[in-house]
Swiss-Prot record:
It comes from Geodermatophilus obscurus (strain ATCC 25078 / DSM 43160 / JCM 3152 / CCUG 61914 / KCC A-0152 / KCTC 9177 / NBRC 13315 / NRRL B-3577 / G-20). Its EC number is 3.4.25.1. This is Proteasome subunit beta. Belongs to the peptidase T1B family. It is found in: Cytoplasm. InterPro entries: Ntn_hydrolases_N, Proteasome_sua/b, Proteasome_suB-type, PSB_actinobac. Pfam families: Proteasome. Keywords: Autocatalytic cleavage, Cytoplasm, Hydrolase, Protease, Proteasome, Threonine protease, Zymogen. Component of the proteasome core, a large protease complex with broad specificity involved in protein degradation. The keyword Hydrolase applies. GO terms for biological process: modification-dependent protein catabolic process; proteasomal protein catabolic process. The gene is prcB. It catalyses: Cleavage of peptide bonds with very broad specificity. It is an enzyme of class 3 (hydrolase). The lineage of its organism: Bacteria, Bacillati, Actinomycetota, Actinomycetes, Geodermatophilales.
Length: 280
């Protein structure tokens, strides 16, 4: 008799035993082969034959937090995609951006979204922002074996803290390393191949208590500067009408900033720099 037909219910015992509010723990008990980090990988480096997402940037502002990512994925020295989306809503109050092995990263994001939804259904309440950050750290740690073979996933996580103390900034950002260590960032952060250039740009344009428009400009300009110096980061592409994916998370929740708004910001940056070059 198949393990899935065991018992009168027709379900495996793993489906009937309550393993807690973690969907990842349930999956580990019921179907561990479906977890991203549990699959065998070749004992050779495979980093140059899989698409990799590149640069993700996040900045806080006076009403919350923004996160954006470019649209390029690379495979070694080749551009494997110009239209990949790297920033996703994790739930109603948080977002996640991916850098690293794109296939595994996207699968991890989907599992993480289910993880947060499962917790809310089981417990009847939303996990705290710190709790969400810690859950993501556990999932990254589970991918360590694949990371050591070149299939690393290094996300950036940000959200609106519903439990923020009066006077404290509600927008918060968390970065990670491949071992699952998570670190809260102050003000802004960036991950991926162009992160060094993005951070250098943010040092000049970001300041505390920016309004939403200024923060959006700072973020898009950071991605523009990253693309200028990093071949794996794609800049705004008006010919194909491809612009960074940007999400805003504030007291109203997580929403995607319309492409037309991002296009207008990118156009202003390009026009201003073109005018400055002409005067030089």
């Amino acid at each position: 008799m198949s393990e899935y037909s065991a018992g009168r219910s027709g379900f495996s015992p793993a489906y009937l035993d309550r393993v807690g509010s973690s969907f990842t723990d349930f999956l580990a008990a019921a179907a561990p082969h479906l977890l991203p980090g549990s699959r065998p990988v070749p004992q050779i480096p495979v980093g140059n034959v899989t698409p990799h997402g590149t640069t993700i940037v996040s900045v806080t502002y006076d009403g919350g937090v923004l996160m954006g990512g470019d649209r390029r994925a690379t495979m070694g020295n080749l551009i494997s995609s110009r239209e990949i989306e790297k920033v996703y809503p994790a739930d109603a109050w948080s977002v996640i951006g991916i850098a690293g092995a794109a296939g595994i990263a996207i699968e991890m994001v989907r599992l993480y979204q289910v993880e947060l939804e499962h917790y809310e259904k089981i417990e009847g309440l939303t996990l705290s922002l710190d709790g969400k950050a810690n859950r993501l750290a556990q999932m990254i740690r589970g991918n360590l074996g694949a990371a050591l073979q070149g299939l690393a996933v290094v996300p950036l996580f940000a959200g609106f803290d519903l439990d923020a103390a009066p006077g404290a900034a509600p927008g918060r950002i968390f970065s990670y390393d491949v071992t699952g260590g998570n670190y809260e960032e102050r003000g802004y952060s960036a991950v991926g191949s162009g992160s060094l250039f993005a951070r250098n740009s943010l040092k000049k344009t970001w300041r505390p208590n920016l309004d939403g428009d200024a923060a959006t400009r700072s973020l898009v300009e950071a991605l523009y500067d990253a693309a200028d110096d990093d071949s794996a980061t794609g800049g705004p592409d008006p010919v194909r009408r491809l612009y960074p994916i940007v999400y805003r998370v504030d007291a109203e929740g997580a929403v995607r900033v319309p492409d037309d708004e991002i296009a207008a910001v990118a156009t202003r940056i390009t026009d201003e720099r073109s005018a400055a070059d002409g005067q030089g």
